[in-house]
Amino acid sequence: MQRIVTLAERKAAEAERRRQAVEDLRVALTDYARAHGGRFLLFGSAARGTMHYDSDVDILVDFSPGALDDAWSFAERACWERRLDPDITPFSACKGRFRERVMPELQVLA
């Protein structure tokens, strides 16, 4: 007889899957940034290693204006391929309190 998997177990398994997927995502984003002369910056639960079963991946994109759209598209696709929900913002749009809040936890991928 199959063991019944509880909701808490399913949530824990999904959180772990997301944590592992973020590790793979880091490699892909770093490789892209190095090849295209920009950088991605992770923050939030993905940067802290505290992904939950429903966490998204917070990414700042810091590329030249001519490369920004392609870098953004790459980050989106890379997240979707790993069944992660991206929350992407251009680094240039980060101002004031938001920047102050996320700066301590930023992980630069370049």
Where are the regions that the model predicts?
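Helical scaffold of the NTase/Pol beta-like nucleotidyltransferase catalytic core
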Residues: 1-41, 77
